[in-house]
Amino acid sequence: MKEKISQFGTNRNKGFSMTFENGFAISVQWGTENYCARRFEKKDPRELRFWRSSTAEIAVLNKKDEFIKINNGSDGVVSGWLSTDTVAEVIVIVSSTKIQKEIEKKSLTLSSY
């Protein structure tokens, strides 16, 4: 029986990651050090029961845990200030794609980048 590699992860009450059966992963973060609406917040998300933000940043990783270029920004690997709808669109792309170049190409077409 093939071992499943899909999993969820959490990060300091300010984000999560998802690794999909295809081996690709996405990190979604909305904390004080991330490119999001709460970037300059003085509160520590770990001390609060709930932590919300109107925007988030994402990064996508390949099967070797290396960052994939997903935008035209300066570093190209982290994309910030994204709405929930845009994050959901990227999750669909990452979870349903078989090759890295397809993720790179499709993510560049999203309007919020």
Predicted region positions:
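Catalytic phosphate/metal-binding cores of nucleic-acid and nucleotide-processing enzymes, i.e., regions
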Residues: M1-Y113
